[in-house]
Amino acid sequence: MSASKILVGCWLGLAVLSVSTVLLGNAGATLALAAGVLLAAFGKAWLITDGFMELRHAPPAWRLLLLGWPLLMAIGVLLTLL
């Protein structure tokens, strides 16, 4: 698959996740909806890291650092909501 097709796919994925984040955020204030918003945000972080930054071919330590941080932040936010 060419790089431009990958980037277009990433852009479409980011657009879908952004719209879903807005829809979930406006749907109410439950723990499940908050978890859905955070899951969409983590999906966006993954798309940016692997797609736009092209770290899918990088050493695992770099990917762990760049995907571990948003995961830790999402877990922290969920823990504060409990």
From Swiss-Prot:
The keyword Cell membrane applies. The keyword Transmembrane helix applies. Pfam families: COX4_pro. The chain crosses the membrane at residues 1-21, 22-42, 62-82. Its main location: membrane. It is a multi-pass membrane protein. Keywords: Cell membrane, Membrane, Transmembrane, Transmembrane helix. GO terms for cellular component: plasma membrane. It is found in: Cell membrane. InterPro entries: Cyt_c_oxidase_su4_prok (IPR005171). It comes from the Bacteria. This is Uncharacterized 8.5 kDa protein in nirQ 3'region.
